[in-house]
Amino acid sequence: MKLSKGVLSSILLTLLIKPIESSIVNTDGELICAPNNPTDCYPKIFEPTTEWQTIREGQDIPAGLHVRLNMENLAREAKILDPSEETEGSSELMVNAEQNNDNGDNSHQMTNEDQANEIQQKIKEFKQTQGKSKVSTVDLNDFQSSVDEVQHYREGGDANRLSTALDTLIDLSHDIEFGVKLTQDSSVFRSLVDVSKSVQDEDLQEKVYRIMGSSLRNNPDAVNHVLKNQDATFVECLFDKLDTDASDVIKKRILGIIHALTQNSHFNAKYFNSNNANSAVDSLISVFPSLESQSQTRLMNILEDLKLLGGANSNEKRAIEESADPKSQYSHFLQHSLADSGVASEDQFKLYFNKLSEVHSQDKSLKPSKAFMEWLSKEAELRSKGNKERDSSYTEEDRQFDQDLLRARHVVFGNPMGLRKALADEL
């Protein structure tokens, strides 16, 4: 029995597209609405079919899709990979009936179960064929030569050759297969980290971090490779770099890498566990005020995807959702964490309050919520009377912080004229 490749493709698509769509399309996902037409809404995550569809502004593209540029209208389009369009290999697949005897009418007869089993076997073989690398030899040579250049680069080496190699890897790292190849060998990512440390040119550093982020984005296999093949210093270096005077474009790339790593629940359990006293959330909170707008947006996207921005009341949620300003989202997050006892220690309390004061001092348009001001009034009174429970003994640093909190209540969040009366009452 012969099954044409078109027929088999139909069977494959019937069996395979549904699970693909169920994992790609999330009915609870975020929607994007056109600013000039609020009724024109579409999923933030692109929902593919077997037909070419235009990728709308702001949509995220899941990994594993065919993407092209429509030369007629210059719009980007994407669709699910269709096995029937594969041009390599035979145009048909053979399914041979088992011949147990030479009986004329029955020699080629198969039960429905036998036919189904054999078709499933052919489907399995077909999927294995589809899973093989589609990377051309030329691309692979370019990939390997570029990787070799990065791995053999030493401080003071040929920057032009390095830049060319990085450009090649930037182009290839967007492909899911090349992303996996880049991460399978632990020495490749380690070499990229070494290059980022050894070169002074920020353009070259930015290229390195862009390669890392592109190879990990929407690529869980690549993320798994990195988490298995790299040690903790890889992550530590990323967070350390955020807390330097590096350019904002580099910090944005690093946040993209961290964001990609949060696809993995094991990574989140270790680094973003709310019960962890050294949670990486605090590192992100600490650097936020020093970032520029695009990096601030990317940082808040990380917190949002980690589901850390919930807990506000309905009015606050509406305000957060309607605000495109990351500073406003950041402020709401810190206000809620402080007022609703969402901090784990006195040190975390100080960090959150100081950073909230800093961002409100930077942007006078930010306004505290009524609930936060009511909490702050009680907190300031409690601390001014020395009735606040501490993690340890009351120190001079604690006393200074309590005074700063009282001042911030009026100067930063309230009426500065009220500070004089508050200080007089305290005396």
Swiss-Prot record:
The keyword Cell wall biogenesis/degradation does not apply. A motif (Prevents secretion from ER) lies at residues 424-427. GO terms for molecular function: adenyl-nucleotide exchange factor activity. Keywords: Endoplasmic reticulum, Protein transport, Signal, Translocation, Transport. Residues 1-22 form the signal peptide. It is found in: Endoplasmic reticulum lumen. GO terms for cellular component: endoplasmic reticulum lumen. Pfam families: SIL1. Interacts with KAR2. Required for protein translocation and folding in the endoplasmic reticulum (ER). Functions as a nucleotide exchange factor for the ER lumenal chaperone KAR2. This is Nucleotide exchange factor SIL1. It comes from Debaryomyces hansenii (strain ATCC 36239 / CBS 767 / BCRC 21394 / JCM 1990 / NBRC 0083 / IGC 2968).
